[in-house]
A protein has these predicted regions:
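Acidic, glycine-rich flexible loop segments
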Residues: 129-177
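Membrane-inserting hydrophobic helices used for pore formation or membrane fusion
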Residues: 1-148
Length: 210
């Protein structure tokens, strides 16, 4: 199984900046790379270099991608680089929104919004939780999300809503990720102790329903 280049242009740009390229590496080779980072276990971050644990996490993200967990991989990569993540329905690539739209929980939410008749909404009653049974990849990227929206009217009727789905990805705080990596990363016991290089990031997904 060959690794694929990052599909997100922000991540590809950061990979180029820090001279990171896992394309063409098999999962076995990626695991050996993580082992090498553990054995060296030294900080070498400076200028255009990342430290060993950051590189190990990026390799783990690539393993997740190769196993079909694109959304989870992206969140880890953005977390390593400490960049907030956003998607808009107008973007050329919307992996989180694409998977979110396939879930029953989000389709139920959309029906709730459309039936509400509200011009604007936000707050706790408009939150929902992604379960692993909804979509395993999405479960590792989003958890309990909050939403807000604005309805746009033609005449006296609301024709569509623009909504924002928000979450915070905080790997060090959440413990839902173990079963994703325990079966794919050989040195997970070491890697899961290195969450200090992962940064909490904000996730904002913007879309329209109607």
């Amino acid at each position: 199984i060959s690794s694929r280049k990052a599909s997100n242009p922000v991540i590809q740009s950061m990979n180029d900046k820090y001279h990171v390229d896992f394309s063409g590496m098999s999962i076995d080779e990626l695991n050996k790379f993580i082992d090498k980072m553990k054995d060296e276990d030294q900080t070498r971050a400076s200028g255009n270099l990342l430290n060993n644990t950051q590189l190990a996490w990026l390799a783990a993200a690539q393993i997740a991608r190769d196993k079909g967990y694109e959304c989870a991989a992206l969140m880890v990569e953005f977390s390593v680089y400490n960049i907030d993540y956003s998607e808009s329905v107008t973007d050329s690539s919307t992996p989180l929104l694409d998977k979110l739209n396939t879930t029953t929980v989000f389709n139920n939410y959309k029906n709730k919004v459309l039936n509400s008749g509200l011009k604007d909404f936000s707050g706790g009653s408009w939150s929902f939780t992604i379960q692993k049974s909804d979509n395993a990849d999405l479960f590792y990227a989003l958890h309990r999300v909050s939403t807000s929206g604005t309805g746009f009217m033609i005449g006296n009727s609301i024709m569509y809503y623009l909504i924002t789905v928000h979450d915070t990805f905080d790997f060090a705080y959440d413990n839902n990720y173990d079963d994703l990596f325990t079966t794919t990363v050989n040195n997970w016991a070491w890697l899961c102790q290195q969450t200090h290089v992962l940064n909490p990031i904000e996730i904002n997904l913007s879309t329209a329903i109607g």
